[in-house]
């Protein structure tokens, strides 16, 4: 395993940045108070599909799900799979709960989603090795200043952890619209090519969003601002 530098995200027991923005709307606060306790990832002990959902099923893990659009859409596409999402920002958690709750009409509730309000790596450590089918890291905070590079989730420590938790043949997906983070990510992933196979045959494979990859609000915002967006898929060796 790679020796991790001091300050690597896996060595830090804290989160950077804000954890709350605008006050929650009444409906969102109600979901945080009532639905979140029902679908929250347990705060201790092993995190397995059987414990979360009552039986074994393919597991997906999203690191920092934002407003939950991608997680909810994937969960709707794959109702027999289980989805775990972690997000430190309570406003994002509240928005994800809206997606999970559905409207009891055209969009029924999603029973295959579990949410952790807090540090994704804390939960990831408690998942058994080789248990995950997919891990998603979509439009993470780029921390563009060089002195903050160690705060990026795309670093050696988190990648070793992701590699350990993915089953052989499992898939790691990464998306960004930030050129500095793009270069950083490719540099880091090159160091981990013994663990991951890059699933790209030509430039189009990372310049066009693949099928089965729902758009996030951050991606939509980036496109509206004229940014180029890049999509990466790696398979666990």
UniProtKB/Swiss-Prot annotation:
PROSITE patterns: SAM_MT_TRMB. GO terms for molecular function: tRNA (guanine(46)-N7)-methyltransferase activity. Substrate binds at residues 145, 177, 216-219. Pfam families: Methyltransf_4. Residues 1-24 are annotated as: Disordered. Pathway: tRNA modification; N(7)-methylguanine-tRNA biosynthesis. InterPro entries: SAM-dependent_MTases_sf, tRNA_(Gua-N-7)_MeTrfase_Trmb, tRNA_methyltr_TrmB_bact. The active site is at residue 141. Coiled coil: none annotated. Catalyzes the formation of N(7)-methylguanine at position 46 (m7G46) in tRNA. The gene is trmB. Keywords: Methyltransferase, S-adenosyl-L-methionine, Transferase, tRNA processing. This is tRNA (guanine-N(7)-)-methyltransferase. One of its GO terms (cellular component) is tRNA methyltransferase complex. The keyword S-adenosyl-L-methionine applies. Belongs to the class I-like SAM-binding methyltransferase superfamily. TrmB family. SUPFAM superfamilies: S-adenosyl-L-methionine-dependent methyltransferases. It catalyses: guanosine(46) in tRNA + S-adenosyl-L-methionine = N(7)-methylguanosine(46) in tRNA + S-adenosyl-L-homocysteine. The keyword Lipid biosynthesis does not apply. Its EC number is 2.1.1.33. S-adenosyl-L-methionine binds at residues 62, 87, 119, 141.
């Amino acid at each position: 395993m790679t020796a991790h530098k001091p300050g690597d995200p896996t060595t830090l027991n804290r989160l950077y940045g804000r954890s709350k923005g605008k006050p929650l709307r009444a409906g969102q606060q109600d979901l945080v108070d009532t639905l979140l306790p029902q679908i929250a990832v347990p705060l201790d002990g092993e995190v397995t599909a059987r414990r979360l959902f009552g039986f074994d099923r393919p597991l997906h893990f999203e690191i920092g799900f934002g407003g939950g659009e991608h997680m909810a859409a994937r969960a709707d596409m794959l109702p027999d799979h289980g989805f775990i999402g972690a997000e430190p920002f309570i406003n994002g958690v509240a928005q994800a709960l809206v997606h999970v709750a559905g409207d009891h009409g055209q969009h029924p509730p999603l029973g295959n989603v579990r949410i952790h309000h807090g540090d994704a790596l804390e939960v990831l450590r408690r998942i058994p090795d080789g248990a995950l089918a997919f891990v998603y890291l979509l439009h993470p905070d780029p921390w563009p200043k060089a002195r903050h590079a160690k705060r990026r989730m795309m670093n050696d420590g988190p990648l070793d952890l992701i590699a350990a938790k993915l089953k052989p043949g499992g898939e790691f997906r990464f998306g960004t619209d930030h050129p500095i983070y793009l270069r950083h990510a490719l540099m880091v992933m090159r160091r981990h090519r013994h663990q991951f196979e890059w699933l790209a045959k030509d430039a189009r494979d990372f310049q066009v969003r693949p099928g089965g990859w729902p758009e996030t609000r951050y991606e939509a915002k980036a496109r509206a601002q004229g940014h180029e967006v890049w999509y990466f898929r790696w398979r666990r060796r």
